[in-house]
UniProtKB/Swiss-Prot annotation:
The lineage of its organism: Bacteria, Bacillati, Bacillota, Bacilli, Bacillales. The modification Phosphoserine is found at residue 271. Its EC number is 6.1.1.16. Coiled coil: none annotated. GO terms for molecular function: ATP binding; cysteine-tRNA ligase activity; zinc ion binding. Zn(2+) binds at residues 30, 210, 235, 239. InterPro entries: Cys-tRNA-ligase, Cys-tRNA-synt_Ia_DALR, Cys-tRNA/MSH_ligase, CysS_C, Rossmann-like_a/b/a_fold, tRNA-synt_1_cat_dom, tRNAsynth_Ia_anticodon-bd. ATP binds at residue 270. This is Cysteine--tRNA ligase. Binds 1 zinc ion per subunit. It is an enzyme of class 6 (ligase). Keywords: Aminoacyl-tRNA synthetase, ATP-binding, Cytoplasm, Ligase, Metal-binding, Nucleotide-binding, Phosphoprotein, Protein biosynthesis, Zinc. A motif ('HIGH' region) lies at residues 32-42. It comes from the Bacteria.
């Protein structure tokens, strides 16, 4: 039985995770509208839900992960007009850019990345069924969802229909029955990209695409539906209304939403000029640092993006990597066994269990990272031992590799290779033997500048990364 507990936006409480089918998870994550490069707010969602997927797989679940592309909508049509290009060309360019960005950030591709334009027939069929059942109606080529007919409308965002009605209004030119009704199909305007339908030429509304594609690739009911907090209403609320009206079944068992991202304590917006694109920022900083930073705060909490906090994340990640590479280096001088192996192996197991405990509690990556720092501290203490064993070193290395892989952090080799360091130490030893202390000091300083610390012992010169 699962020990994972997750916070469900639908019920506003933590619940024991019990997928519909044992050991299998069907997960749908709302993807980007591909009219531009993704910004760091999009990146947070991509990183968070990639990590949750990785953790579920680490715990033995088989995850089918679907994340869509909105490759036709008002923003794309506007961009096409401004750039003098067609919508498919712009969409394709930014889909490829999206893959480049998320790959740099350590995110795995989804099992399926459906596009709206490749699923028009599925969407039309879905809309027609809603019309047949009285949940939708057509007016002059537009099709609207009859919101009041769905009695549970507002259950995800915890708003009553009357509260919503008070803030709703009908725009000029709209022919809706009710201000709360929303578009499922939009009649084509002159010069716009469009498709044939039973209601004339047009294109899908935003909300219907996710309902149709989630059902096509994952079935009537899915385990986890996820996205940014800003999508809770109206997007996810409308998805529930559409899908449950069609199937008569719950659309998703668990709803997960990541918190907002602020820039220097201000909301990110183009008008404030603080809009940060992933494409730009990863030219300036290591993408792994950006990922580590995003995971340093619980996914449901707001996160504040600043240079100071990024620098702190960079130093934290360097601490973990330094411990890891110092362990790798010590393997060369370790023995088969030492007397206190079992004691150290027990400490490593404690950290393994602590990591699982924290991540089982609503995927708390912030506390999971704290466990990794404790593992690093234990590793550093072990490296102070006069004699170290291969068995313990390997156990530490495996633990670092396994837990960092859950967080999507790769352990790449340092720029200065062990062989290069050993060659410089050999050169320094010869210089000392020949009483060329100036050269010996120069080599020590050169290594120190590369964060390599030397320790001269009766058994020879040892080194470690600082």
């Amino acid at each position: 039985m699962s020990s994972i507990r997750l916070y469900n936006t639908l019920t506003r409480k933590k619940e024991l995770f019990e997928p519909l089918e044992p050991n299998k998870v069907k997960m749908y994550v709302c993807g980007p509208t591909v009219y531009n490069y993704i910004h760091i707010g999009n990146a947070r969602a991509a990183i968070v839900f990639d990590t949750i997927r990785r953790y579920l797989e680490f715990r033995g679940y088989e995850v089918k992960y679907v994340s869509n592309f909105t490759d036709v909508d008002d923003k794309l049509i506007k961009a096409a007009r401004e750039l003098g290009e067609d919508v498919p060309t712009i969409a394709e360019r930014f889909i490829q850019a999206y893959f480049e960005d998320i790959t740099a950030l350590g995110c795995k591709k989804a099992d399926v990345h459906p596009r709206v334009t490749e699923n028009i027939d599925t969407i039309i069929e879905f809309i027609q069924t809603l019309i047949d059942r009285g949940y939708a109606y057509e007016v002059d080529g537009d099709v609207y969802y009859r919101t009041r007919k769905f009695k549970e409308y507002g259950k995800l965002s915890h708003q009553s229909i009357d509260e919503l009605k008070a803030g709703a209004r009908i725009e000029v030119g709209e022919k809706k029955e009710d201000p709360l009704d929303f578009a499922l199909w939009k009649a084509a305007k002159e010069g716009e990209i469009c498709w044939d339908s039973p209601w004339g030429k047009g294109r899908p509304g935003w909300h219907i695409e996710c309902s149709a594609m989630a059902r096509k690739y994952l079935g009537d009911t899915i385990d986890i539906h996820a996205g940014g907090q800003d999508l809770t209403f109206p997007h996810h609320e409308n998805e529930i209304a559409q899908s449950e009206a069609l199937t008569g079944k719950p659309f998703a068992k668990y709803w997960l939403h990541n918190g907002y991202l602020n820039i220097n304590n201000e909301k990110m917006s183009k008008s404030l000029g603080n809009f940060v694109l992933v494409h730009d920022i990863i030219q300036q900083i290591d993408p792994q640092v950006l990922r580590f930073f995003m995971l340093s705060v619980h996914y449901r909490h707001p996160i504040n993006y600043s240079e100071e906090l990024l620098e702190s994340a960079k130093k934290g990640l360097e601490r973990l990597k330094t411990s890891y590479f110092n362990l790798k280096h010590r393997l060369q001088s370790s023995t088969n066994l030492t007397d206190d192996d079992d004691q150290w192996l027990a400490r490593i197991q404690e950290q393994h269990e602590a990591f699982i405990r924290e991540m089982d509690d609503d995927f708390n990556t912030a506390n999971g990272i704290a466990v990794l720092f404790e593992l690093s501290k234990q590793a550093n203490l072990y490296l102070l031992e006069k004699n170290t064993s291969e068995r313990v070193i390997h156990a530490f290395l495996r633990e670092f590799e396994q837990l960092l892989d859950v967080l999507g952090i790769t352990l790449q080799e340092e720029e200065l290779l062990d062989e290069e360091i050993e060659a410089l130490i050999q050169k320094r030893n010869e210089a000392r033997k020949n009483r060329n202390f100036a050269l010996a000091d120069q080599i020590r300083d050169e290594l120190k500048a590369k964060n390599i610390i030397l320790e001269d012992t009766p058994q020879g010169t040892r080194w470690k990364r600082g």
